[in-house]
């Protein structure tokens, strides 16, 4: 089962709010997810991002691949750097 970390759209029309979820790559964008690991609100200024860093690192170490947008969010929060350090220290 290929697992991805991606955004699940919530909110109302023209007012998007996203959950950062772990889901099977074959499931629909807003379909069933395995676990929620954070939220992303692009509407407010500054952008609001909340991520459970421990869960994100755990899922990536198990082989979950983040989508391009989630990878950018993780990079801004410093999670990708921690993941690479953790991966290279083994």
From Swiss-Prot:
GO terms for cellular component: cytoplasm; small ribosomal subunit. GO terms for biological process: translation. SUPFAM superfamilies: Ribosomal protein S16 (SSF54565). One of its GO terms (molecular function) is structural constituent of ribosome. InterPro entries: Ribosomal_bS16, Ribosomal_bS16_dom_sf. The keyword Cell inner membrane does not apply. Belongs to the bacterial ribosomal protein bS16 family. This is Small ribosomal subunit protein bS16. It comes from Oceanobacillus iheyensis (strain DSM 14371 / CIP 107618 / JCM 11309 / KCTC 3954 / HTE831).
